[in-house]
């Protein structure tokens, strides 16, 4: 099991120098990859290009590029450029974001998300393979049929023969799509106890493409806080989990609350949402059951975290994308180092 580090959103509570120090320390410690996110602040590719110029061996991934933010052709152009600049170290992670960001920020309808994702990934793959892009799907047609557009192919070649594409997915149908079209799955709120079900969904999609999961990378993003004080470690996790389960999306459409519900915490997730959407963030965090926190994070004493790492390996995780969670940069570096020791 390879270790990755999630940097999250650039500039959100950390400086550029701190982000760079974290990545360079991860590279020194032998971490396999560093991942950068985007929402409606910093963009991921600019940060990734900056990191590529200041690192030498660590792989760099988008976690994720938002599908509504770019045409598939622009995503392929960006990915190929980053792969060349990094010397073949780029991993392309894609995700739909959510209806609030897609429609409120990017002006893109969130309708037919499965069909749109299928069309998008198919065109990105065609472009990265330097095939002439002539495609007719349910939500996308290239070239447009009623104008002067012509089928084009990418004029540059990625450094890697097959640039790996990862899909962020949570629901069963999206997982199957990842298994069918992608090289890896970016999981979130990942439970090792439910890994068998995840693998079944991924395998069903892979079978549609006439393949199995051999070489497919299961790569969940997992929050980490190592501390001898278990209660304090759980409390570090509460604001982050409450944000996603309670506040990411609307009451009617929150993928993270849905995931908690699939794990058997539907009532607790509803309580977290009630508090969070009413502005009671501390109460939202307090409503998170300890059992849910332990299920989807690595937190607590070293022995407990070591057991969690073993469970993730047993669950078939190929790349564990860790998010060292702490209130200061110094503490984040400490978490990064401690985890490397425990995973060795």
Task: Report each predicted region and the residues it spans.
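Active-site-adjacent structural elements that line small-molecule/cofactor binding pockets in enzymes
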Residues: 1-344
């Amino acid at each position: 099991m390879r270790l990755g580090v999630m940097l999250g959103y650039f500039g959100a509570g950390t400086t550029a120098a701190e982000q760079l120090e974290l990545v360079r320390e991860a590279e020194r410690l032998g971490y396999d990859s560093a991942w950068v996110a985007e929402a409606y602040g910093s963009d991921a590719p600019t940060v990734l290009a900056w990191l590529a110029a200041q690192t030498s061996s660590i792989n760099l991934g988008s976690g994720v590029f938002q599908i509504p933010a770019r045409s598939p052709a622009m995503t392929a152009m960006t990915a190929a450029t980053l792969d060349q600049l990094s010397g073949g170290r780029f991993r392309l992670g894609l995700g739909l974001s959510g209806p609030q960001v897609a429609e409120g920020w990017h002006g893109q309808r969130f309708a037919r998300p499965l069909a749109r994702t299928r069309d998008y990934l198919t065109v990105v793959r065609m472009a990265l393979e330097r095939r002439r892009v002539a495609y007719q799907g349910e939500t996308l047609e290239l070239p447009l049929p009623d104008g002067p557009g012509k089928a084009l192919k990418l004029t540059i070649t990625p450094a890697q023969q097959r640039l790996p594409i990862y899909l962020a997915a949570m629901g069963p149908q999206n997982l199957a799509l990842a298994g069918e079209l992608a090289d890896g799955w970016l999981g979130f709120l990942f439970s090792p106890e439910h890994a068998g079900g995840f693998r079944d969904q991924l395998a069903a999609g892979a079978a549609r493409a006439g393949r199995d999961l051999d070489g497919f990378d299961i790569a969940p993003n997992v929050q980490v806080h190592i501390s001898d004080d278990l209660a304090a470690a759980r409390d570090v996790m509460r604001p982050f989990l409450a944000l996603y389960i309670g506040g990411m999306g609307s009451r009617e459409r929150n993928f993270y609350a849905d995931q908690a519900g699939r794990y058997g915490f539907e009532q607790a997730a509803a309580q977290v949402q009630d508090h969070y959407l009413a502005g009671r963030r501390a109460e939202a965090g307090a409503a998170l059951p300890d059992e849910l926190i332990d299920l989807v994070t690595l937190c607590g004493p070293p022995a407990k975290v070591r057991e969690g790492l073993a469970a993730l390996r047993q669950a078939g995780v190929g790349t564990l994308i860790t998010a060292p969670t702490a209130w200061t940069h110094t503490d984040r570096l400490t978490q990064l180092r401690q985890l490397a020791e425990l995973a060795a």
